Amino acid sequence: MTVSLEGLYRGESLTSEQTEQLFGELLRGEMDPIVLSSLLTAMKVKGESPSEIEGAARALIAAAKPFPRPDYEFCDIVGTGGDGLYTINISSTAAIVGATCGIKVAKHGNRSVSSKTGSSDLLEKLGIKLDMSPETARHCLDEANICFLFAPHYHSGMRFAAPVRQALKTRTIFNVLGPLINPARPTYQLMGVYSPDLLEPIAETLHALGLKKGMVAYGSGLDEIAVHGETQVAEINDGHIRYYTLTPTDFGLKYYPLESIQGGTPDENRKITETLLAGKGTDAQQAAIAINLAPLLKMGGLVDTLKQGAEMAIETLRSGDALDKVTQLATLSHKE
């Protein structure tokens, strides 16, 4: 191993370069599992720094299967997971509605780790081929405004960390890396985090990784923008990071109790999503999708305000057109 961990054991942070080197070794299968275990634990106890998160993310992006990146603007909407609140699939549903509105979304996701249904679990239930090739995914993004990048398909080196992660049974740096390592490298992004302590380090990391426009959100216990309370936000805009609070009122929406957006099993969540996309969801469910899609519609230039974004999202949901978008994506995803 080329980088000494002595400083880390003393509570000092690694540099971005040191972390990138270490994670490069891990992804090539060159790191002893005991060393990896102590690396992850020492980082967790100290608290992962922005430089460490950035270095690890750079190593994962560099080692990922390449994606034919387009030259147009496109986004991702994703959460860290780990909030333990088992809501409906907000980000996946919002991605589909966003594509129907006219923004382009390259959704990077995985199977569920801590919730009942991850984005992959849901999209698979909707008939979308998870392991489509990068070229097919790019074609979907071009033609349908949306594609799905299944994390294990692009980040095969992560398999070397899996046994240690399972044995540790605790959150580590990997829990926050997933949303940062989309191999398509979106130009703008909404990312939800499971703790307010992550707002600043994640915003700084996204900025360091070159994201021009983005929002990191923690919504009263949720890794989404909340319909049931306040949302703390870190907004990235051309090199500046601004911290503030949002409420449903800022979107022209009412407050709804958290129980009104509860999810369930993969089958139950698929039914809820299909009902929503067909224009028949509850007001609370529609509000949860709209409040999380509105910032992306604004960043993507389709609207000028968050209220206009929420209105566009709800109008699109109620039209039922988003269900056709799922059919289009499912069909294109199977064409190799």
Curated annotation (Swiss-Prot):
The protein depicted here goes by the name Anthranilate phosphoribosyltransferase
Q: Which domain of life is it from?
A: Bacteria
| Pathway linked to the protein | Amino-acid biosynthesis; L-tryptophan biosynthesis; L-tryptophan from chorismate: step 2/5
The cofactors named for this UniProt entry are: Mg(2+)
Q: What organism does the record attribute this protein to?
A: Tolumonas auensis (strain DSM 9187 / NBRC 110442 / TA 4)
GO CC: one term?
Answer: cytosol
What the entry lists under Gene3D superfamilies is as follows: Nucleoside phosphorylase/phosphoribosyltransferase catalytic domain (3.40.1030.10), Transferase, Pyrimidine Nucleoside Phosphorylase, Chain C (1.20.970.10)
Provide one Gene Ontology biological process annotation: L-tryptophan biosynthetic process
Tell me which UniProt keywords the record has, alphabetically. Amino-acid biosynthesis, Aromatic amino acid biosynthesis, Glycosyltransferase, Magnesium, Metal-binding, Transferase, Tryptophan biosynthesis
